[in-house]
């Protein structure tokens, strides 16, 4: 039972992240706590080492991100700051073979028992699929949730290329081929064809340098 006179609700959310992939080190390097400031940027704790952070800003959502899947807590009302911690499981621990990181978020939310909806949340438990995550913007009228930022697409120019060219082409190929593995193969061939003029020019330049090497 929640008392009627409390001004806010304290929330403690934690997860011991289970191993899902064969490549242990690569999975660890792609797992972290992500969070989005209200009407602001998406930030994350270190993916490669233990990290902790405390913020007083309003937060729209917080996520425990794994290599291919994420669990996300989206607040209808903003979370009032958060204390976050992520640390790898010790290699000598009995849990190391099945788990790879401990993650914890402590936060709070304004609460009024007299409101029609005193504390509403949306919880996403699913794959890091760009278009699927982006589709959740429809559940928030006030701002772009930016859940698609959970998908790592590289820096600046590479992110633009991946967002507007590579992902749409891949989704189209998946629909046509009906098989993701075949779609990846076809996309790889297409990229090699597109990049062939640049790579061929590089090979020719290297060959010329090898011919000149004895003279130099």
What are these regions (language model features)?
Residues 126-179:
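Interfacial loop/helix-cap signal at membrane boundaries in integral membrane proteins
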């Amino acid at each position: 039972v929640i008392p009627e006179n409390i001004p806010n609700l304290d929330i403690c959310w934690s997860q011991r992240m289970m191993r899902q992939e064969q490549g242990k080190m690569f999975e660890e390097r792609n797992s972290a706590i992500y969070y989005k400031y209200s009407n602001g940027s998406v930030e994350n704790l270190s993916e490669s080492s233990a990290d902790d952070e405390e913020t007083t800003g309003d937060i729209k959502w917080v996520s425990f991100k794994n290599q291919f899947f994420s669990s996300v807590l989206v607040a209808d009302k903003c979370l009032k700051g958060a204390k976050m911690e992520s640390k790898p499981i010790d290699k000598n621990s009995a849990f190391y073979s099945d788990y790879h990181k401990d993650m914890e978020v402590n936060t709070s939310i304004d609460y009024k028992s007299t409101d029609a909806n005193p504390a509403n949340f949306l919880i996403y438990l699913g794959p890091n699929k760009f278009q699927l995550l982006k589709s959740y913007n429809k559940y928030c009228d006030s701002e772009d949730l930016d859940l698609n930022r959970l998908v790592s697409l590289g820096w600046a120019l590479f992110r633009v290329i991946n967002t507007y060219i590579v992902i749409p082409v891949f989704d189209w190929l998946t629909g046509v081929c009906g098989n993701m593995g075949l779609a990846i193969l076809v996309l790889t061939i297409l990229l090699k064809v597109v990049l062939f003029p640049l790579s061929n020019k590089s090979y020719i330049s290297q060959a010329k340098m090898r011919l000149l090497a004895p003279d130099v």
